[in-house]
Swiss-Prot record:
Gene Ontology CC annotations of this record: cytosol
Any single GO BP term: acetyl-CoA biosynthetic process
InterPro entries tied to this protein: Cit_synth/succinyl-CoA_lig_AS, Citrate_synth-like_lrg_a-sub, Citrate_synth-like_sm_a-sub, Citrate_synthase, Citrate_synthase_sf, Citrt_syn/SCS-alpha_CS, CoA-bd, NAD(P)-bd_dom_sf
Name of this protein: ATP-citrate synthase subunit 1
């Protein structure tokens, strides 16, 4: 299975994003626009104790989250990583396959594994998992992941994880030395290195917040949404974010403020700490104690959200499960006061936080603690075609045009008519055909005529060629579609396909002003049979009742039946020669349909001619006869009939006889004696 780690540092795209130029054996060719990354042969070197991520961090994404994965790969690309941060996807329901993603403007394939064990064995360099499992299954999946010593960090995105389960996960993780971020978190980000899931928002926001390169400020918050605001504030007032983590809003997060701030304290590249707490819980006091004891010495800019809670007469539950003060100690106002007294940089309001942060940053720049790095070139953002089209940035000609139906909105439309109106107005099958076939509502009598044609052509017994083909195919054990198609493929000029020809010939003669006898004589001189005239069984004395039904309906309902009258006059001429040269059902339907197109008021003359030339009449026969062919399939299946073999006594065998050797050059010739 393809993997997604770099084979070399080759710059395959001009952006410093290394990838292999040649495909692995057995894969597609090198010009298929697929970016390939070979699997590593050994695990990466362990990170320092204070670091969770670096520019080589690799992870699994647990759960099928293509948008989040694509966001992570886009972040990797603009950070100029040599390989994607996502090594593979673990999806326990779908089997093992590959998922196609973009690496810049090229495509790459990410393996999808059904089992954690297989994924772990295949990728020894992975030590992070972004777990998108639901609140119902996140406990079991996280416990399974923690059984593998290779995994060092797990981000749990799901909200609503039972508190007992969350505490158990945190307990086991602490024993095993695993860092848990979450539950109920958007994740975290280390600019220029790695981002968890949807952290940082869309790519334009990530670029605006300068998260594609490292800064000097490390922050920790509960809220994922507010972490995005911190990214924005820090990018505008300092040299940018060094690392940011949202620990999650539940009451029992896997790691707390102090865990991450101690990491930042130990990291020499992180110069300023930012703590964004909130009402509820006492985790901020652990940080206060660490500052008082001199464990944390770096400057901390801090604020606890929720000071407005004191304005309410009763305690208020804010958005997070943990945002509820059970005592005065847990209120935001008390926390802010305590942090200020401990030496934190605490603004008077959250709105004052950017100015205070800039003040602290400028001070560290002035004393040389922070040396701002030159600003790199802003990377180009690969943008999805669908997003660019939605923004109106691009246009392209459509590959297909459809004028009959639209499923893009809330309700399906048939030629502009909502499907609910189709049923509310009870337009029936004929009405639906008028919308989809002709893109307009036809009069009720016309829709009824269409339904009548379908009913009349639905079946004509098992002896006709179409039904026989379907029956034989069914008895050979084939499926419904194969058996139906076998019958439909017999429809043509000799079986069921006379409708278009009859409409063409009768219309041409009528429009030329030929009398019925002149029309018959002309066809005879051309050695042509008249389509729609003649029947193998029915005759003038044994009429086809289907034809009688059509004639009766058309005479009663149609505003004009000139072509039908002309065809009946032709029938008078032909039956005078032979009794079975009657106007058959194909011919009758054809001429009546022409009368409908020309006289119902819904079509212009040109439109009527166009629909006839398109083959719409044969379409009526195909649609109607499909009903009967499916019926024959079901009938044979119901009867459990076996494979059909034609009897010998119904076949005349006429075999060729080989002559004695003749003159040179005649070898191999055979003569059939009949």
């Amino acid at each position: 299975m393809p993997s997604a780690t770099s084979t070399n540092g080759a710059n395959g795209n001009g952006n410093g994003n290394g990838a292999s130029a040649s495909p692995a054996p057995g894969n597609l060719s090198a010009n298929d626009n697929i970016r390939r990354f070979a699997a590593p042969s050994r695990p990466l070197s362990p990170l320092p104790a204070h670091a969770l991520f670096n520019e080589k961090t690799r992870c699994f994404v647990y759960g099928l989250q293509p948008r989040a994965v694509q966001g992570m790969l886009d972040f990797d690309f603009i950070c100029k990583r040599s390989t994607p941060s996502v090594a593979g996807i673990i999806y326990t329901f779908g089997g093992q396959f590959v998922s196609k993603m973009y690496w810049g403007t090229s495509e790459t394939l990410l393996p999808v594994y059904q089992e954690v064990q297989k994924a772990i064995a295949k990728h020894p360099d992975v030590d992070v998992v972004v777990n998108f499992a639901s609140s119902r299954s996140v406990y079991s999946s996280t416990m399974e992941l923690m059984e593998h010593p290779q995994i060092k960090t797990i981000a749990i995105i799901a909200e609503g994880v039972p508190e007992r389960r969350a505490r158990e996960i945190a307990y086991v993780a602490k024993k095993k030395g695993i860092t848990i971020i979450g539950p109920a978190t958007v994740g975290g980000i280390k600019p220029g290195c790695f981002k968890i899931g949807n952290t940082g928002g869309m790519m334009d926001n990530i670029v605006a917040s300068k998260l594609y390169r490292k800064g000097s400020v490390g922050y920790v918050s509960k809220s994922g949404g507010m972490s995005n605001e911190l990214n924005n504030i820090i990018s505008q007032t300092t040299d940018g974010v060094y690392e940011g983590v949202a620990i999650g809003g539940d009451r029992y997060p896997g790691t707390t403020f102090i865990d991450h701030l101690l990491r930042y304290q130990a990291d020499p590249a992180c110069k300023i700490l930012v703590l964004l707490g909130e009402v509820g819980g006492v985790e901020e006091y652990k940080v206060i104690e660490a500052v008082k004891q001199g464990i944390i010495t770096k400057p901390i800019v801090a604020w606890a959200i929720g000071t407005c809670a004191s304005m309410f007469k009763t305690e208020v539950q804010f958005g997070h499960a943990g945002a509820f003060a059970n005592s005065q100690l847990e209120t935001a106002a008390t926390k802010n006061k305590s942090m200020r007294e401990a030496g934190f940089y605490v603004p008077d309001t959250f709105e004052d936080m950017p100015a205070l942060l800039k003040q602290v940053y400028d001070k560290l720049v002035a004393d040389g603690t922070i040396v701002p790095a030159p600003e790199p070139v802003v990377p180009k953002i690969p943008i999805d075609y669908s997003w660019a089209q939605e923004l109106g940035l691009i246009r392209k000609p459509a590959a297909f045009i459809s004028t009959i139906s639209d499923d893009r909105g809330q309700e399906l439309l048939y030629a502009g008519m909502p499907i609910s109106d189709v049923f509310r107005e009870e337009i029936g099958i004929g009405g639906v055909m008028s919308l989809l076939w002709f893109r307009r509502r036809l009069p009720d009598y016309a829709a009824k005529f269409l339904e009548m044609v379908l009913m009349l052509t639905a079946d004509h017994g098992p002896a006709v060629s179409g039904a026989m083909n379907t029956i034989i195919t069914t008895r050979a054990g084939k499926d419904l579609i194969s058996s139906l198609v076998a019958g439909l493929l017999t429809i043509g000029s000799r079986f069921g396909g006379a409708l278009d020809g009859a409409a063409e010939e009768f219309t041409k003669a009528f429009d030329k002003g030929l009398s019925p006898r002149e029309f018959v004589d002309t066809m005879r001189k051309q050695n042509k049979l008249i389509p729609g005239i003649g029947h193998r069984v029915k005759s003038r004395n044994n009429p086809d009742l289907r034809v009688e039904l059509v004639k009766e309906y058309v005479k009663a309902k149609f505003p004009s039946s000139k072509l039908l009258d002309y065809a009946l006059a032709v029938e008078t001429v032909t039956t005078s020669k032979k009794d079975n040269l009657i106007l058959n059902v194909d011919g009758c339907i054809a001429v009546c349909f022409v009368d409908l197109l020309r006289n119902c008021g819904a079509f212009s003359t040109e439109e009527a001619e166009d629909y006839l030339s398109m083959g719409v009449l044969n379409g009526l026969f195909v649609l109607g006869r499909s009903i009967g062919l499916i019926a024959h399939y079901l009938d044979q299946k119901r009867l459990r009939t076996g494979l059909y073999r034609h009897p010998w006594d119904d076949i005349t065998y006429l075999l060729p006889s080989l002559q004695q050797p003749g003159p040179p050059g005649t070898e191999g010739r055979v003569e059939v004696q009949i």
